[in-house]
Amino acid sequence: IATAYAKEGANLVLTGRNVQKLTDAKEELEKKYGIKVLPVQADVSAGSDNEAIVQNVVKQAIDTFGRIDVLINNAQASASGVTIADHTTEQFDLAVYSGLYAAFYYMKACYPYLKETQGSVINFASGAGLFGNYGQCAYAAAKEGIRGLTRVAATEWGRDHINVNIVCPLAWTAQLEQFQKA
C-alpha cells in the first residue's frame, strides 16, 4: 500500500511496532520514489494510553506535512489458528486493540484534518470475518468491528465530504471453493 502511494508521489507517515522495519521502509521508499516518509513507532495495545499514542502520531504528521489527505488503517496482529475455546483474553485483546481500537482512535484523531482536506479513509477488514474462518475468532471479530465502524463513519462523515471505504481481501477458502462449484 505504501509503495502504491509512493509511486504516485505521496508523502507518507508509516506506523508500526518495529523501528528497524520502519527505518528500512523509509530509506527504501525515499530513495526509490523521492518522497518524504515519517516513520513513527506506535503500538495500540491493552493497558496503554492509546489515545495519547495516536494523538502523538497525528501531531507529528501535521507538524511534518501540515495536512492529512488519506488515512489507511491496515494494521492487525492476532493469534491465528487458536480456537474460541482455547483463546485467552490476552490473545483476543491483541486482535481487538491492534485492529478495531487502532482504527477507531486513528479515525477519531484524524477526523478534523480529513474534514479540512475533504480526505479519505480506507480501512481494511477481511474475508475471515465474512466466512468465519476456523481459528480466527479474535481476528474476525476485530475485522467485522472495523467493517461496522467504517459503515457508520461513511454515513456520519459523508456530509463533511470525507470518503470512507472498506476493503475486504479474501483468501481462497474451502467455502469459496464450494461456492465456485455451486
Q: Which residues are covered by each model-predicted region?
A:
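Canonical Rossmann dinucleotide-binding motif of NAD(H)/NADP(H)-dependent dehydrogenases/reductases
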Residues: 1-13
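Conserved glycine-rich Rossmann-like NAD(P)H-binding loop of the short-chain dehydrogenase/reductase
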Residues: 10-24
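Substrate-binding pocket helix/loop in short-chain dehydrogenase/reductase
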Residues: 82-84, 88-93
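Active-site loop immediately N-terminal to the catalytic Tyr-X3-Lys motif
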Residues: 85, 131-137, 159-160
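Active-site helix of classical SDR
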Residues: 107, 142, 150
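Alpha-helical segment proximal to the catalytic Tyr-Lys
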Residues: 112, 155-159
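Residue(s) in the substrate-gating loop at a strand-loop-helix junction
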Residues: 126
